[in-house]
Amino acid sequence: MNQTPLRLLIHGASGRMGQALLRLAAEHPESLQIVAAVTGRAPAQRVVDGVPFFAASELPGAPAFDVAIDFSLPEGFDPLLALCVERGAGLVSGTTGISSSQRQALEAAAASIPLVWASNFSLGVAVLDELVERAAQALAGWDCDIVESHHTQKKDAPSGTALTLGAAAQRGGAEPHYASLRAGDIVGEHLVQFTGLGERIELVHRATNRDIFARGALFAARQLQGRAPGSYRVRDLLQ
């Protein structure tokens, strides 16, 4: 039976994640169709490999889409969120640095559309998030430490993913402590350690390729299709 491809709008198409999304989505033309690629500035070419490109200022004129995937900058976030609500389209966003007012706008939009915002779209990290919460619940009174390692160009510390894992530990009743390492070209490594008397548990996730984040975002977009309005976590979409 023929399946209608999921129509995607890629917001932040000129960035590293945007380029990965365009490349990986093109590997599945039977199920994914990029109907618009949006960049901050006017594109040098209007159509590249069959994908129409738009400047951010032209966003209101984008063709119909089912889900927008956003890896851009906070200043471009508001118009995209408004367009998704107006069109009744889902939103997958990994844009970092959004303000508290933008987070409130996300919460309000979840009453109208299905959406997911995450600092990390790795499916492995989504599972780790759940494991950390369960371990914290079961190991009351144990020390909880989170050590994150990344490449030398990463400026923020602790990483957004480390803070997300810390929030999972806190939901389970633990009080996490953080340590950060910047070295070489490490894509991303997160260790969550629970230490008791005479024993410890180490939960580790290692990313060796940045494509995992783009694949996770495409997975999230597929999973949002047909879902009721609401704010979802990546781990919710695995169930």
From Swiss-Prot:
EC number: 1.17.1.8
Native source species: Stenotrophomonas maltophilia (strain R551-3)
Catalytic reactions on record: (S)-2,3,4,5-tetrahydrodipicolinate + NAD(+) + H2O = (2S,4S)-4-hydroxy-2,3,4,5-tetrahydrodipicolinate + NADH + H(+); (S)-2,3,4,5-tetrahydrodipicolinate + NADP(+) + H2O = (2S,4S)-4-hydroxy-2,3,4,5-tetrahydrodipicolinate + NADPH + H(+)
Residues holding NAD(+): 12-17, 94-96, 118-121
Database matches in Gene3D superfamilies: Dihydrodipicolinate Reductase, domain 2, NAD(P)-binding Rossmann-like Domain
Uppermost EC category: oxidoreductase
Biological-process GO terms, alphabetical: diaminopimelate biosynthetic process; lysine biosynthetic process via diaminopimelate
Subcellular location(s) of the protein: Cytoplasm
Cytoplasm keyword on record: yes
Keyword annotations from UniProtKB, A to Z: Amino-acid biosynthesis, Cytoplasm, Diaminopimelate biosynthesis, Lysine biosynthesis, NAD, NADP, Oxidoreductase
Domain of life, per lineage: Bacteria
Pathway as given in its UniProt record: Amino-acid biosynthesis; L-lysine biosynthesis via DAP pathway; (S)-tetrahydrodipicolinate from L-aspartate: step 4/4
GO annotations of cellular component type: cytosol
Family of the protein in this entry: Belongs to the DapB family.
Active site positions: 150, 154
InterPro entries in the record: DapB_C, DapB_N, DapB_N_CS, DHDPR_bac, NAD(P)-bd_dom_sf
PANTHER family: 4-HYDROXY-TETRAHYDRODIPICOLINATE REDUCTASE 1, CHLOROPLASTIC-RELATED (PTHR20836:SF0), DIHYDRODIPICOLINATE REDUCTASE (PTHR20836)
UniProt feature coiled coil, ranges: none
Binding site for (S)-2,3,4,5-tetrahydrodipicolinate: 151, 160-161
Pfam families noted in UniProt: DapB_C (PF05173), DapB_N (PF01113)
UniProt-recorded Gene Ontology molecular function terms: 4-hydroxy-tetrahydrodipicolinate reductase; NAD binding; NADP binding; oxidoreductase activity, acting on CH or CH2 groups, NAD or NADP as acceptor
Its biological purpose: Catalyzes the conversion of 4-hydroxy-tetrahydrodipicolinate (HTPA) to tetrahydrodipicolinate.
Keyword Transmembrane belongs to the record: no
UniProt protein name: 4-hydroxy-tetrahydrodipicolinate reductase
